[in-house]
Amino acid sequence: MTINYTTNLSLAEPVTGTESGTWGDDVNKGLTDYLDISIAGTLALTSASFTANALTLANTTGSSSGNGITTTTAQYYIIKCSSLSTNVTITAPSSSKTYVVVNLDPTYTVTIKASGQTGITIPVSSKAL
């Protein structure tokens, strides 16, 4: 079974002539589910989602056995933060991915950045693209 993955979103690319009997699952769980969350999916985060006020997102991949989407999957388009107990930082992969970050918290800020960068801070009750 041979599946390649795209560079930016880690979408499944089954190799021609492989995946006999599982190709549909590979596409549905490795491509369709990811396209859905990368175009219109919302990742809802609260203070419980963060460890030491930080969260690192990572590209995940799907296969015939499951889509691999988790609460730290980087492919989501919208990230909503609420019920925070302190200012938080989200670190996303360094790629050409766009996020809409919505800070619904009335007290604390949300910073989103790539590893090694300072990032941008979304003020309380604000959103940024």
Predicted regions and their residues:
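Surface-exposed loop/edge segments in extracytoplasmic proteins
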Residues: 117-121
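Exposed extracellular interaction/assembly regions and N-terminal maturation sites
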Residues: 2-11, 15-110
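C-terminal beta-strand-rich structural cap/linker in extracellular carbohydrate-active enzymes
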Residues: 122-129
